[in-house]
Amino acid sequence: MAQKFVPEAAELCENSLKKFISLIGTVDKLLVISGAGISTESGIPDYRSKDVGLYARIAHKPIYFQDYMRSNRCRQRYWSRNFLAWPRFGQAAPNINHYALSKWEASDRFQWLITQNVDGLHLKAGSKMVTELHGSALQVKCTTCDYIESRQTYQDRLDYANPGFKEEHVAPGELAPDGDIILPLGTEKGFQIPECPSCGGLMKTDVTFFGENVNMDKVNFCYEKVNECDGILSLGTSLAVLSGFRFIHHANMKKKPIFIVNIGPTRADHMATMKLDYKISDVLKEM
């Protein structure tokens, strides 16, 4: 099942791999940026990969922050889908890539990890030197008072508020990298959304929605890490979204080496010191 979402990679060339590893070996302080491609081997699809990415398989339309905040029907649509997807998304396990990066923390040459993912798999693998740039789908936050609870706790509250819903809709659709699934229109009708137990406000998964600004404290912290590093390794991201690409661009402006492992083109290919179109695990297990 996990391999279903791993795109077809270029044939592994030992000489290219050795050169790549040798070049990275010259970097004293390495900053790593990870994207959805690092989690495809855990059975979570990415967005843009050819043939197997979410956008290649279905007409996925993400919910925008402004729509979520102003429309109860939009919130019903979001939470009914998220409710049915959670058992599968919440049980996703780290793969060899997450564990490899967790072990890198023991090295003085590893500086920090910035992940664009919201699946929490880096933390599940034991990583501590990590910034979840877009937040975490493993917790839910009040949009008014900042009350936070675990996603599983909120799942229990959703289940209590919607008896029989998951039994009636037993076949979840395609899973998205943010824990969303696709359901027929109208499925959400009547779905009840528990409010904040502290202030009665709207609850929302603690992730950055489309149309919502990334937390600037996180952004500034990540810029500091880029300034401090001697080079960047980008893993499993096309860098199509500005929130991650800006750090690569900043490093490039400072003439820092950039290394990329991604199956398919990225927005920063022309900036790369070297790029490999290989499966991430095939590279990391040799490093």
UniProtKB/Swiss-Prot annotation:
GO terms for cellular component: mitochondrial matrix; mitochondrion. Keywords: Metal-binding, Mitochondrion, NAD, Transferase, Zinc. The keyword Transmembrane helix does not apply. GO terms for biological process: innate immune response. It is found in: Mitochondrion matrix; Mitochondrion. It is an enzyme of class 2 (transferase). Residues 10-287 form the Deacetylase sirtuin-type domain. Pfam families: SIR2 (PF02146). Its cofactor is Zn(2+). Binds 1 zinc ion per subunit. GO terms for molecular function: histone deacetylase activity, NAD-dependent; NAD+ binding; zinc ion binding. Its EC number is 2.3.1.286. Ubiquitously expressed with high expression in the pharynx, body wall muscles and gonad. The active site is at H134. This protein may be expected to contain an N-terminal transit peptide but none has been predicted. NAD-dependent protein deacylase. Catalyzes the NAD-dependent hydrolysis of acyl groups from lysine residues. Plays a role in oxidative stress resistance. Interacts with pyc-1, pcca-1 and mccc-1. Belongs to the sirtuin family. Class II subfamily. HAMAP family: Sirtuin_ClassII. This is NAD-dependent protein deacylase sir-2.2.
